[in-house]
Amino acid sequence: MPSVRTEDRVSREVSITRLFDAPRELVFRCFTDAEHIATWWGPEGFTAPECASDPRPGGKLRIVMRGPDGAEFPVDATYLEVEAPTRLVIESNAVGPDGAVLLEAINTVTLVERDGATEVTVHARATALVSEAAAMLVGMDAGWTQSLQCLDDVLTGAVDRQFVIMRVFDAPRQVVFRAWTDPEQLQHWWGPKGFSLTIDEIDVRPGGTWRFTMHGPDGVDYPNVSRYEVVDAPRRLVFMHSGEGVTAEDPAFRSTVTFDDMGGTTVLTMRAVFETAAARDLVQEKYHALEGGNETLDRLGEYLDTR
């Protein structure tokens, strides 16, 4: 590895806490068992086709992450501390194509039992060893946040009953969050291509209601009602969504929209979770929901470009 000037080294720390509705022993195994790790490790859209784990002090952990574009990102790690089922300390290295270490990190994972659920806190301190790797630090917060969401999806069985769409917008997350909550801005982009929007009511607070009608290009109207459960500006929105009424033909779903800062740009992840896989499939067949969601975010991107 080439020598590195001290001034090239850049460090960053992140700390993320997440509550999982699962026993602590199971969650701990998800962090240490290779078969479990492979089901959730990595940001949204990534897979882990290669994973080997030896969870003991001095034992090795190797993960090869594969991005949506097929690019692979090897991670070589060593377990420093293993206290089942309460604590892990892992030293990890991100490796470049030539085998050189680009980034090194100390990751501390603590697991606390909370009335049958498990509170997980991940504290990561990473140092870029070369200036070219400094950009990797920018996405560390978003990467861990999305990875833990993927773990939650696995633990709750949501993988087969949800839609997930992710985009990167060249705008600060405060601006993107505002576009989701300001009725004047929503008028400019909400809905698939060719749709327009009438907002009858919007009260962006926990317990508040958003009542609106989407007007299709064929003249068909689609009444909608959403009720906000979480409003955490500018990080997250959670709302229950339904049409005119919840029926077997029009099932409700819970939408979670996260806004992760990545060096002044925003990684937006939109997740819609249904009660069953059949309900998800029905909405996809009837409304082409996935295509509509992608077109909606296309319109959001076009709108933000004009700001």
Model-predicted regions and their roles:
Residues 1-47, 153, 157-196:
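Hydrophobic ligand-binding cavity/cleft-lining segments
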Residues 8-10, 55, 69-73, 99-103, ...:
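A generic structural micro-feature
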Residues 18, 50-51, 75-81, 104-113, ...:
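Hydrophobic/aromatic beta-strand elements that line small-molecule binding cavities or substrate pockets
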Residues 24, 56, 80-87, 110-119, ...:
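A short, structured loop/turn motif at beta-sheet edges
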Residues 27, 37, 61-63, 79, ...:
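Hydrophobic pocket/interface hotspot
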Residues 49-93, 198-242:
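Glycine-rich portal/gate segments that line the openings of hydrophobic small-molecule binding cavities
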Residues 89-91, 97-145, 240, 244-294:
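Beta-strand/loop substructures that line and gate deep hydrophobic ligand-binding cavities in soluble
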Residues 151-159, 302-307:
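Surface-exposed helix-capping loop/turn segments at secondary-structure junctions
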